[in-house]
Amino acid sequence: MTRIAIVGASGRMGKVLVEAVCDNPDASLGAASVRVGSSLVGADAGEIAGLGKKGVACVDDLAQVMDDFDVIIDFTSPETTLELLALCRKEGKAIVIGTTGFSDQQKTLLAEAAQDCPVVFAPNMSVGVNLLLNILALTAKTLGDDYDVEVIEAHHRFKKDAPSGTALRLGEVVAEAMGRNLNECAVYGREGITGERDKKTIGFETIRAGDIVGEHTVMFATMGERIEITHKASSRMTFAKGAVKAALWLHGVAPGLYDMQDVLGLK
């Protein structure tokens, strides 16, 4: 039985993560945290998630309950994640990171921390999206430079970063398969008189509206035909179940930086 700590247990994703842990027979809810100074400190994490009492009182500092869990699941903010990584390095705990919006410098710090503790870092924990990555690599390699590539993503109005971490990862996979550097070929939105499309660019378009859980489409278009590969998530539980699967896989493995491709055996 793997004991899991949920960070941000009172948030939209946190509540779903608590439910996913409680629903998995191989996992148990070991700890739950909320914001520092929150009025929910001491409240039962199960009751916050609408599941009834689970016997786990929320804390605002996981360092207080280090003996109560084996793996952390975090879908909060880059700043919070880096603080948790420092704790994991010190205590030898494993962590599953679904947080997005990291800068290149923050990603470097994350990779350094993974030298001392096991880390699964993936912008999208769903099985479907991770299968999509493999499909995209094959498609991009086969089609090559004759096809224009556009990545279109849509999320709810509350999402703070754009493009989404998943969209950027989709773009990275396509760029790598085509022998390009995404940092050099990405175009984020278009406005005004832009001139003809540069053949080797990868375009990104972002939609933020309503309660859209997450939709991603990669378009490969040339003269005469267009291929669109799409993934649509209709529930956050899709991501939560993937995160719990990652936590179960991560428990007991050697320190290192892993992703969902490792968890799912797709590499």
UniProtKB/Swiss-Prot annotation:
EC number(s) stated in the UniProt entry for this protein: 1.17.1.8
Residues forming the catalytic site: 155, 159
Superkingdom of the source species: Bacteria
Binding-site list for NADP(+): 35
Subcellular location per the Swiss-Prot or TrEMBL entry: Cytoplasm
MF (Gene Ontology): 4-hydroxy-tetrahydrodipicolinate reductase; NAD binding; NADP binding; oxidoreductase activity, acting on CH or CH2 groups, NAD or NADP as acceptor
Protein family per UniProt: Belongs to the DapB family.
Function per UniProt: Catalyzes the conversion of 4-hydroxy-tetrahydrodipicolinate (HTPA) to tetrahydrodipicolinate.
Protein known as: 4-hydroxy-tetrahydrodipicolinate reductase
